[in-house]
Amino acid sequence: MATWSNFNLQNSASPLMEQIIFFHDHTLVILIMITILVGYLMISLFFNSYINRFLLEGQMIELIWTILPAITLIFIALPSLRLLYLLDELNNPLITLKSIGHQWYWSYEYSDFQNIQFDSYMIPINEMKNNNFRLLDVDNRIVLPMNNQIRILVTATDVIHSWTIPSLGVKVDANPGRLNQTNFFINRPGIFYGQCSEICGANHSFMPIVIESISIKNFINWINNYS
């Protein structure tokens, strides 16, 4: 989850998020290099006294400043396209989770198991415990097994919502009458927080998402106890 004075992305909990962080750093390096180059040229032109009143065209310099930006864009576009296709790829998910957005809470259904569905509301401030996080904890967490491919189906019943877990690199719009899907792979145990990322009304800020990642053995025990 995000913490105070954290200017970076959240710590990765999935391979896709690691790739997103790598692409962010890769693009940022290119932007810094461009900024330094342009800044150096502007400062050098400002302080030198070279002029050429008879310069009407320069095919070579025009060729250079056309080819170099094109090459730079290719270095950004290729890893971006690779990552885009990785985010859309589904690889034999172990379980399917269905998430339904409401004003202003989430409900979940484990489609592979019978009678496992629940609503997830934010814990009000006056009911919080010492180990709860303000505006982030819920009464019913999503429990999922780590080190397994998971598919999530997302929809809504009223307005557009967005199901988002930053540390997993997942953000899916929940549209009424439409079923969107994506997949993720949690590679470590822990509790991961997210929030609705689409303005959906007065209490938009009060519909958090919490995933509890556990081992497959504990997940099976949870399924049996819930049933």
UniProtKB/Swiss-Prot annotation:
Record localization: Mitochondrion inner membrane
Co-factor note (free text): Binds a dinuclear copper A center per subunit.
Protein name: Cytochrome c oxidase subunit 2
Binding-site residues for Mg(2+), renumbered to this chain: E198
Gene name tied to this protein: COII
Source species taxonomy: Eukaryota, Metazoa, Ecdysozoa, Arthropoda, Hexapoda
Ranges of the Mitochondrial intermembrane topological domain: 1-26, 82-227
Species, as recorded: Choristoneura occidentalis
GO cellular component terms, semicolon-separated: mitochondrial inner membrane
Residues passing through the membrane, by range: 27-51, 63-81
Residues binding Cu cation A1, per UniProt: H161, C196, C200, M207
Catalytic activity: 4 Fe(II)-[cytochrome c] + O2 + 8 H(+)(in) = 4 Fe(III)-[cytochrome c] + 2 H2O + 4 H(+)(out)
Entry keywords, A to Z: Copper, Electron transport, Magnesium, Membrane, Metal-binding, Mitochondrion, Mitochondrion inner membrane, Respiratory chain, Translocase, Transmembrane, Transmembrane helix, Transport
Single GO biological process annotation from the record: ATP synthesis coupled electron transport
Subunit record text: Component of the cytochrome c oxidase (complex IV, CIV), a multisubunit enzyme composed of a catalytic core of 3 subunits and several supernumerary subunits. The complex exists as a monomer or a dimer and forms supercomplexes (SCs) in the inner mitochondrial membrane with ubiquinol-cytochrome c oxidoreductase (cytochrome b-c1 complex, complex III, CIII).
PANTHER family, sorted: CYTOCHROME C OXIDASE SUBUNIT 2, CYTOCHROME C OXIDASE, SUBUNIT II
Family to which this protein belongs: Belongs to the cytochrome c oxidase subunit 2 family.
Pfam families: COX2, COX2_TM
Mitochondrial matrix side: 52-62
Main location: mitochondrion
Membrane topology designation: Multi-pass membrane protein
GO molecular function terms noted in the UniProt entry: copper ion binding; cytochrome-c oxidase activity
Positions annotated to bind Cu cation A2: C196, E198, C200, H204
Keyword Amino-acid biosynthesis: no
Required cofactor(s): Cu cation
InterPro entries: CcO_II, CcO_II-like_C, CcO_II_C, Copper_CuA, Cupredoxin, Cyt_c_oxidase_su2, Cyt_c_oxidase_su2_TM_dom, Cyt_c_oxidase_su2_TM_sf
